[in-house]
């Protein structure tokens, strides 16, 4: 029996993403590819005669020229960005509109009324994410106007971009003057870390006055903050794998898809930077604090009312006016959030997780977790990359 010839594939990612790269490498191992990094090509592409290429078509003119040369030769190419939508090329992209929706809904669930976007530059991907964030925000019933958009490279002269003090003053002037509590959405850990640092410098409390959410797969810069940063996991590894799979099919002769293939975000890791429900009503604010402090106790609305010294009707009315949900729904929401964090970050048994969330036993945890997420706790833990 004749063995299939190994395919020679070029990988040109600028800048390199280890998560996308791992997805590509995993498919390459399964398919038996010879995978070559663009940067390691001796003497450039001139003498290379491969079968296909995976690229990230951003603003690198050399990479754009590479793609043009490959396509003139008839070499299949798959792009892993949403940039340069005018270039007709097969793509496997992150679903930036879904990411924007997820961010807006996350902040709205926490009762934030004001929102803003901060980024260093402005790309087509940023436009998609912010556009979806703004559209979703505007459609939500309890928000106070459209989110503000702040882009450093648009609002500061080019000569000041690398002036750390000037950049700090730019951040500080916006953050000090913004309405509070403010929900801030950033495209990556670098911008969100800078927002957090400027909040500390200005004496602005995170998350009570400014809550911060970013996107990305690299969790080290999110975890290693004075206030750890919440993050939407974009799922770069799956994107890399699916892009490689599409390229393999194109080499086999499959017709390219008419539209870009989009990969939904993997999920959202809630950390301290958004782990807060904004409440201007003093009674609701006190109730929320009590629920958070006593989340491991198996108590409900009756015990909460006794502690606050108010009747259930009054408390329900205040919650409905302030949050649009009942005290019981908020207790359940906080319990599920706590359970999700424990499943993701610890190797505790389901019984231990249930106990720490104020639930009776693992069976009840499984019931409500499946109802709210569509997955049993064990499957959710595996999907989220938990212990």
Task: Give a label for each model feature.
Residues 1-57, 62-307, 312, 316, ...:
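Bacterial carbohydrate/catabolite-sensing allosteric modules
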């Amino acid at each position: 029996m004749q063995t299939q010839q190994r395919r020679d594939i070029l990988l040109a990612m600028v800048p390199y993403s280890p998560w996308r790269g791992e997805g590509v490498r995993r498919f390459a191992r399964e398919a038996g590819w010879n995978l070559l990094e663009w940067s390691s090509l001796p003497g450039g592409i001139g003498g290379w005669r491969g079968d296909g290429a995976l690229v990230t078509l951003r603003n690198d003119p050399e990479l754009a020229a590479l793609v043009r040369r490959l396509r003139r030769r008839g070499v299949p190419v798959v792009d892993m960005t949403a940039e340069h939508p005018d270039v007709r090329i097969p793509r496997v992209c992150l679903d930036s509109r879904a990411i924007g929706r997820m961010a807006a809904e996350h902040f709205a669930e926490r009762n934030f009324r004001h929102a803003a976007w901060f980024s260093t530059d402005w790309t087509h991907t940023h436009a998609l994410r912010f556009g979806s964030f703004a559209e979703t925000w505007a459609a939500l019933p309890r928000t106070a106007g459209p989110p503000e958009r702040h882009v450093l490279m648009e609002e500061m002269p080019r000569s000041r971009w690398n002036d750390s003090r000037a950049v700090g003053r730019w951040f500080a002037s916006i953050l000090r003057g913004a309405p509070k509590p403010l929900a801030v959405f950033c495209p990556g850990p670098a911008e969100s870390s800078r927002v957090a640092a400027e909040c500390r410098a200005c004496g602005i409390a995170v998350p009570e006055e400014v809550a911060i959410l970013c996107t990305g797969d690299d969790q080290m810069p999110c975890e290693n903050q004075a206030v750890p940063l919440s993050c939407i996991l974009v799922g770069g590894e799956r994107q890399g794998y699916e892009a490689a799979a599409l390229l393999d099919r194109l080499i086999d002769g499959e017709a390219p898809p008419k539209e870009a293939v989009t990969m939904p975000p993997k999920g959202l890791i809630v950390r301290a930077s958004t782990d807060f429900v904004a409440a201007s009503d003093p009674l609701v604010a006190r109730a929320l604090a009590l629920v958070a402090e006593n989340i491991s106790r198996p108590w409900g609305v009756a015990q909460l009312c006794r502690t606050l010294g108010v009747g259930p009707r009054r408390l329900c009315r205040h919650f409905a006016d302030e949050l649009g949900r009942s005290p019981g729904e908020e207790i359940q929401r906080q319990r599920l959030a706590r359970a999700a964090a424990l499943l993701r970050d610890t190797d505790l048994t389901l019984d231990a997780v249930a106990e720490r969330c104020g639930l009776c036993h693992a069976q009840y945890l499984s019931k409500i977790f499946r109802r709210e997420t569509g997955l049993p706790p064990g499957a959710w833990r595996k999907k989220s990359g938990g212990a």
